[in-house]
Amino acid sequence: MIDLQDLNIQQKIADYLADDRLDDINASSQPVIYKDTLYTKYIKRILDIVISFIALILTLPLNLILGIITYIKLGSPLFFKQERIGRNEKPFTLVKFRNMTNATDKNGELLPAQQRLTPIGTFMRKTSLDELLNFWSIFKGDMSIIGPRALPFYYYDRFSDRHKARFKVKPGLECPPWDEKHIKRTWENQFENDVWYVEHVSFKVDCCMIFKLIRYTFDRKTSMMRAQCRKGSFLGYSKDGKAISNID
């Protein structure tokens, strides 16, 4: 039986899908038009600096507590670091508190992520507390408050040209769905929402999305629905051009 949770098998499937259909999808997909405006060049960055600085000050005590708990439960290293795709495909290092053990199977291979997730890690994910250190990435200029979610580099070659347009802007804490019908998380909904954002980014849009992000965080029903929605790992595209995962 094929284990679709195995990263090596996922990569082989992704390579096959890219070779089999990515050229045809690129030839038929709609281009994405990004307009660099006064807001995107200057004002958005100023707002990111101000908001992230305030957030870092306000969350410092909480981050210290989370750091202590993480160290007690998991020891050293304290942080999880991973290279992610930034604006214009430039790499940056995403830093979070560790929330998984390094438990392995009898062959020395790491167990699946869900089996290594600690209770405190589960709590941090459900409450988005694992996102707090991202304010440092925003303050440094690697990320923005609003923008497409930062993804690992091994996804890059799986993207269509249309969806690669999401890298024309900085990644963000979240890019809430503009269309409430797409609140359920699927890769297709997420990527199409990302490219919509790239084409429409403005002060008004960012303000609306910040409000939605706050609402999602504190609305228990919405946050639970989103937390329980599993997307799996992005593998590529179906023959009709829809983004698919290992659980589709």
How should these model regions be labeled?
Residues 1-29, 133-248:
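Hydrophobic structural segments characteristic of membrane proteins
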Residues 19-23, 80-116, 174-193:
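Short, glycine-rich, amphipathic interfacial segments at transmembrane boundaries or analogous
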Residues 27-42, 112, 116, 131:
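Juxtamembrane loop-helix boundary motifs flanking transmembrane segments in multi-pass membrane proteins
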Residues 31-102, 208-248:
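A hydrophobic, helix-centered structural microdomain
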Residues 36, 103-119, 123, 152-158:
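Cytosolic-biased juxtamembrane loops and peripheral soluble domains of multi-pass membrane proteins
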Residues 87, 123-126:
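Feature for secretory/organellar precursors and membrane-associated catalytic proteins
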Residues 125-134:
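Short acidic-aromatic low-complexity motifs
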